[in-house]
């Protein structure tokens, strides 16, 4: 009885041994009743009861509003003490009974308004009538529920009136409870927790020894209160207090700070037993008639508590926590349990400092009662775990400890708040552990050696939280149970040792002393103000120590209120302490046998391995068992007694040995000298199902992928087909049957469009997939199988060679797939005698083969060879062009041209034999692009690589450039690139890929170009070829100026792609325009401006009319990789650019057999040439800039800039003179427009032309038969574009830099 409440316990003891015993018996009965009442599902929502009973944290961790419990406890304690003073012998029972009834009534009223009241009253009334039947009613009927303060008062009064009679019954009930308690004591955890007490289980604790008759209870209460007017007064006071709080309570979702509650002036100490009147008969002589609680007491107990806890706290019964607390019995043996219950009750009441956090956690976790406070966890849980060897005598204590874990899903609430609330009780209400608990046989003996004063509120480190005013009596209920080697939190301490009777173990909520004991250092409140900042703090620390502790933990894991650390803690509680590892009710589809096994499994684990870290400040340095580093003196260390008395860790090192995550709330399990979180410890003992996450208790299970499943859980994640013994596929840790996997995740073949089955071979590359068959995984052009061969991916398609990627029929070199660039054939070979005649042989471009680009040395070698060939070709072209050229202006290459391109300004040059420039006609420009690779038959518009604009300003190495070019130019299925093809075919867009992309309206000259393109490509090609093949030779002096080696270098130096692909403008045009196609197939035997064209049309550039500008390393990226047609004048002049590009393409086509339009960028050095380049004709004439000016060794950084209109011009030059003339006119128009144009597209961050000059010097261009047949690299074009505005401004050196 004494254990029920300090007052009650004291009363029972004072009553005399017999009286004590008698009181104990009724107390036990009443305690049982109380527990039942509190836990009764009718009183509380079933879910709440279940939660309360089964939560891991139920006992030790404060589930609900601790404040409720505190209020109840305090008010009851005060009332009981007063009553005890009046009735000593019976006071114990009365107090106990009252406490139980009051708690039940208050909680029930709060939780279930009318229904709860009826139930509680009925139960209580039955018990009082029966005498023995009077089961304890709510221990603390505080007006904790201000909303129902009147109801509570009525019920309490009724209860008081009927109280005396039911004392005997209460005793009986208590005895019954003791039996239950004994069972609980056997296990470390509370019975509800260990055995997963549901509403039914609640009955186990509550119903045992308790029979409620609502009417009886009500009548008894009424009688009791009639007799106990003092109690009525107290209730009235409480009611008054309640009324104001009622208004307050609903407002805060979270309990107000308990500090507010403290201010209540201590009441004159009433008999300690007053609260415990319910506990049993009132054998104790009424020491003092029930004294009405003083306003201060009431305020302290109710208002402060109410404010802290809020209405929730007022509704203890709603909280499962409240229910769980009712398990404590009043007997001295139960006294520790009672203390535990009180602690729980307190814990249920949110700590004033951490109420918000607690509530937030509870709210976050649906299973947890709103008022559950994670902050309270620390208190209850650690002690229970304290000693591995000692089994917690009371199940409640064990459950409290493990409850936190069991409640992992449920946020454990620290018992600390309970202690704190106890401390808040007025001193007289705060019962000394000794006073509240007469050293009854149950209380002291069961409790075992009293805990050190540090655990008692009075002894708490923080005096303001401690009940220092009260002499710290031996904390029997706080004493660690044998199971707890370390001092358990007050809640745990409240649990009696194993020796205590089971009844005492589940004593009703304890009076103040017990509460105080629980609240002492373990309460979060003990941490002081610091507690308000955190949702949980280690128990027993001062605020400064709390901060020191958290300072050693990562900020993102510090459980500040409403912080990521708080969320982390909640997640970890659920993860590390899975409820289904300990509670049957959280499991699914367990057989009865498995249920039993789970309970045993959970109980054994908790008894043998569960512990809670103890945080202390070191007095001397010691090594950390986690990191082996030294923990300095004065630092905070965490001790785990189960792993040894001296085992200590840094706070940040106190982590699970498996998941390495901080052990939440310091709860750990140990096995073989290692610490585990609850989850991983369970997995060391039993396999865990990967599907349901539950421990596999069955004899059979399925193991796959190194994991385990229940036999019926290893099934297809989609169709639930069991996969035991079946084929399956794991994806993201989930098994799928083959059918579902194919339906959900199968890839589709890019060739045939069919799904690639699990059983089928699959080839994948860069997000593309093919059946691993010769048919599907084959060259997109020639359809030769690529299985086991290197392949060239371009524009979403795969090719066996560069030629195929350009849409040309594969040549032995191209289709060989050797990946080595064949030695470029002499330009003459590549030049076809007849435009229609197929190109005899292309100089294989570095791109020709599907193999990777050559190394720089190889490139250089090829470049040298190609330069020679190109030089020859260009010479021939120049010679042929020379005849055609009416005028040849050699423009001093501007520095910026850097020897890239020197354009012959005159359109006449273009008009010359080189008018064959395909840009002169759409076909002509196309023809250049087509060049040998792009023979009309071979040409596939969809394979035309889209002009790629290199955005990099830095020098490109050829391999990289080639890869980039390939990517940009990779041929793509016609369907994919149909639009592009159309754009390319569009004379405007063809000449200027950028423009094509932009669909820029071509200037008049562009229109002319389009018209030219409209002209049959064959005509233009023929003319061009004729011109190209027979262009008037340019002045001999000019030929040398056009160093073909540079072109060859460009082709060689260029990445194979650059070399292989024509400048995209040229390439696009040539491919796009039928002419170019034809010309490609019928590349003119004469190399059209071999230099520029060679680079562009060299076999290396033999790629389909790709307009790739090559930038050399030495050249700063003055010319942006971006295609800027305006800079070339072609870009700005749209059509002009296109024409230039066509010219370039033609040049490339002529030089390269028109197949290769990969253009090395030749930077025009002469501003005039650049200006001319800007003008379509100028570009054409100047596009012949010698590529050889580029050092072969220097990697050409290719920037795809607008198709060099110069090349187009050159191509036009190759065309018939009439066409050349038209080309010249167009070019002039372009020039005019370009001159007016601003370098809009040359987004080059490149340096001025001087930079180019410094890096490269282009020999003066020669007029090729009056036709400027020269390939203008994109750089040159871009540079020209840049320079053009400057030229327009009269500043030849001015670079139009767009960055």
Curated annotation (Swiss-Prot):
Tissue specificity remark: Expressed in the wing, leg and eye imaginal disks. Expressed within the photoreceptors of the eye.
Please list the residue ranges that the record marks as compositionally biased, kind Gly residues: 1-19, 435-445
- What ranges does the record give for the region Disordered, renumbered to this chain? 1-24, 115-181, 241-289, 368-396, 425-527, 807-865, 902-940, 1026-1249
Q: Where in the cell is it found?
A: Cell membrane
Which stretches are tagged as biased composition: Low complexity? 425-434, 844-864, 1089-1101, 1238-1249
Name all PET domain ranges: 515-623
The keyword Repeat belongs to this UniProt entry's keyword annotation: yes
Q: What is this protein called?
A: Protein prickle
User: What spans are recorded as compositionally biased (Basic and acidic residues)?
Assistant: 516-525, 1136-1150, 1216-1231
MF (Gene Ontology): zinc ion binding
């Amino acid at each position: 009885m004494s254990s029920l409440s300090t007052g009650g316990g004291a009363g029972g003891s004072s009553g005399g041994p017999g009286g004590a015993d008698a009181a104990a018996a009724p107390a036990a009965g009443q305690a049982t009743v109380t527990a039942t009442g509190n836990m009764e599902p009718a009183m509380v929502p079933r879910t709440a009861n279940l939660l309360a009973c089964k939560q891991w944290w139920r006992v030790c961790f404060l589930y609900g509003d601790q404040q409720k419990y505190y209020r109840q406890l305090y008010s009851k304690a005060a009332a009981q003490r007063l009553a005890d003073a009046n009735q000593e012998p019976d006071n114990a029972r009365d107090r106990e009974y009252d406490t139980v009834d009051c708690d039940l009534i208050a909680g029930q009223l709060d939780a279930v308004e009318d229904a709860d009241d009826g139930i509680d009253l009925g139960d209580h009334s039955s018990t009082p009538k029966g005498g023995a039947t009077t089961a304890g009613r709510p221990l603390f009927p505080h007006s904790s529920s201000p909303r129902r303060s009147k109801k509570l008062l009525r019920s309490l009064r009724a209860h008081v009136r009927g109280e005396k009679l039911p004392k005997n019954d209460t005793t009986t009930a208590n005895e019954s409870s003791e039996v239950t308690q004994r069972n609980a004591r056997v296990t470390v955890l509370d019975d509800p927790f260990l055995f997963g007490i549901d509403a039914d289980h609640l009955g186990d604790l509550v119903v045992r020894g308790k029979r409620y008759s609502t009417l009886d209870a009500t009548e008894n209460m009424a009688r009791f209160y009639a007799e106990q007017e003092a109690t009525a007064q107290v209730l009235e006071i409480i009611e008054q207090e309640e009324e104001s709080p009622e208004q307050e309570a609903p407002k805060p979702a979270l309990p107000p700070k308990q500090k507010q509650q403290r201010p209540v002036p201590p009441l004159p100490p009433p008999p300690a037993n007053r609260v415990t009147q319910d506990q049993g008969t009132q054998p104790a002589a009424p020491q003092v008639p029930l004294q009405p609680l003083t306003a201060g007491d009431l305020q302290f107990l109710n208002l402060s508590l109410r404010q802290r806890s809020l209405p929730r706290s007022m509704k203890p019964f709603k909280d499962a926590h409240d229910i769980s607390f009712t398990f404590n019995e009043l007997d001295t043996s139960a006294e520790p349990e009672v203390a535990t219950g009180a602690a729980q009750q307190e814990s249920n009441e949110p700590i004033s400092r951490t109420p918000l956090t607690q509530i937030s956690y509870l709210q976050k976790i649906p299973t947890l009662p709103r008022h559950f406070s994670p902050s309270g966890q620390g208190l209850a849980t650690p002690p229970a775990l304290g000693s591995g060897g000692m089994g917690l005598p009371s199940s409640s204590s064990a459950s409290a400890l493990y409850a936190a874990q069991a409640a992992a899903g449920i946020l454990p609430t620290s018992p600390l708040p309970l202690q704190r609330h106890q401390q808040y009780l007025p001193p007289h209400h705060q019962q000394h552990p000794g006073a509240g608990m007469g050293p009854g046989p149950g209380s002291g003996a069961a409790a075992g050696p009293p805990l050190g004063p540090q655990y008692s509120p009075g002894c708490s480190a923080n005096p303001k939280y401690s009940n220092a005013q009260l002499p710290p009596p031996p904390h029997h209920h706080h004493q660690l149970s044998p199971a707890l080697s370390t001092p358990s939190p007050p809640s745990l301490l409240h649990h009696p040792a194993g020796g205590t009777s089971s009844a005492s173990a589940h004593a009703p909520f304890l009076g103040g002393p017990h509460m105080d004991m629980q609240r002492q250092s373990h309460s979060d409140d003990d941490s002081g103000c610091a507690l308000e900042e955190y949702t949980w703090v280690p128990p027993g620390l001062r605020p400064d120590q709390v901060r020191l502790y958290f300072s050693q933990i990562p900020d993102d894991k510090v459980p500040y209120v409403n912080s990521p650390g708080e969320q982390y803690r909640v997640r970890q509680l659920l993860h590390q302490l899975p409820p289904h590892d300990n509670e049957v009710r959280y499991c699914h589809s367990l057989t009865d046998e498995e249920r039993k096994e789970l309970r045993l499994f959970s109980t054994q684990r908790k008894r043998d391995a569960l512990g809670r870290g103890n945080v202390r400040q070191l007095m001397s340095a010691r090594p950390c068992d986690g990191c082996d580093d030294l923990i300095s003196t004065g630092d905070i260390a965490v001790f785990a007694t189960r792993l040894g008395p001296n085992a200590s860790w840094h706070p940040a090192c106190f982590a699970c040995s498996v998941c390495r995550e901080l052990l939440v709330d310091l709860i750990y399990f140990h096995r073989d000298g290692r610490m585990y979180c609850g989850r991983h410890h369970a997995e060391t003992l039993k396999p865990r199902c990967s599907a349901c996450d539950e421990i596999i208790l069955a004899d059979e299970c399925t193991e796959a992928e190194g994991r385990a499943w229940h036999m019926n859980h290893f099934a297809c994640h989609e169709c639930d087909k069991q996969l035991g013994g079946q084929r399956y596929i794991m994806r993201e840790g989930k098994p799928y049957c083959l059918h579902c996997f194919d339906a959900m995740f199968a890839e589709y073949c890019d060739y045939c469009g069919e799904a690639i089955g699990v059983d089928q071979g699959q080839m994948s590359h860069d997000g593309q997939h093919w059946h691993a068959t010769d048919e599907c995984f084959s060259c997109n052009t020639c359809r030769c199988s690529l299985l086991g061969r290197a392949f060239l991916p371009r524009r979403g398609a795969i090719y066996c060679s560069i030629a195929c990627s350009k849409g040309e029929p594969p040549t032995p070199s191209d289709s060989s797939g050797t990946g080595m660039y064949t030695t470029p054939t002499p330009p003459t070979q590549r030049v076809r005698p007849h435009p229609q005649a197929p190109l005899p042989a292309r100089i294989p471009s570095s791109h020709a083969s599907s193999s990777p680009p050559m190394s720089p040395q190889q490139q250089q070698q090829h470049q040298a060879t190609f330069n020679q060939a190109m030089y020859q070709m260009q010479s021939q072209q120049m010679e042929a062009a020379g005849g055609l050229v009416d005028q040849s202006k050699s423009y001093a290459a501007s520095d910026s041209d850097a020897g890239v391109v020197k354009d012959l300004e005159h359109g006449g040059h273009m008009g010359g034999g080189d008018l064959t420039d395909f840009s002169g006609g759409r076909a002509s420009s196309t023809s250049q692009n087509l060049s040998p690779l792009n023979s009309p038959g071979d040409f596939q518009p969809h394979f035309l690589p889209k002009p790629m604009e290199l955005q990099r300003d830095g020098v490109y190495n050829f391999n990289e450039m080639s890869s980039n070019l390939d990517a940009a130019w990779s041929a793509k299925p016609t369907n994919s690139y149909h639009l592009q093809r159309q754009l390319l075919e569009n004379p405007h867009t063809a000449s200027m890929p950028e423009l094509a992309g932009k669909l820029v309206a071509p200037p008049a000259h562009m229109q002319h170009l389009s018209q030219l393109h409209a002209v049959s490509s064959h005509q233009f090609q023929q003319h061009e070829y004729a011109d190209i093949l027979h262009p008037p030779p340019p002045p001999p002096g000019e030929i040398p100026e056009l160093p073909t080696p540079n072109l060859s270098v460009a082709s060689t130096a260029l990445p194979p792609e650059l070399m292989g692909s024509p400048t995209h403008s040229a390439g696009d045009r040539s491919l796009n325009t039928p002419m170019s196609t034809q010309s490609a197939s019928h590349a003119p035997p004469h190399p059209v401006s071999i230099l520029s064209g060679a680079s562009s049309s060299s076999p290396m550039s033999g790629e389909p009319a790709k307009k790739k500008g090559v930038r050399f390393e030495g050249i700063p990226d003055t010319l942006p990789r971006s295609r800027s047609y305006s800079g070339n004048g072609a870009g700005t002049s749209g059509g002009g650019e296109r024409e230039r590009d066509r010219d370039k393409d033609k040049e490339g086509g002529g030089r390269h057999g028109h197949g290769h339009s990969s253009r090395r960028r030749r930077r025009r050095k002469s501003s005039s040439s650049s200006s001319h380049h800007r003008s379509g004709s100028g570009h054409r004439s100047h596009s012949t800039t010698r590529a050889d000016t580029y050092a072969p060794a220097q990697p050409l950084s290719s920037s795809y800039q607008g198709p060099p209109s110069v090349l187009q011009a050159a191509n036009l030059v190759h065309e018939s003179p009439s066409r050349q003339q038209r080309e010249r006119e167009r070019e002039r128009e372009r020039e005019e427009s370009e001159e007016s144009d601003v370098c809009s597209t040359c987004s080059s961050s490149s340096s001025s032309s001087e930079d180019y000059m410094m890096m490269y010097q282009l020999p003066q261009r020669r007029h090729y038969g009056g036709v400027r047949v020269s390939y203008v690299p994109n750089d040159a074009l871009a540079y020209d574009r840049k320079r053009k505005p400057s030229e327009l401004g009269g500043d030849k050196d001015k670079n139009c830099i767009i960055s």
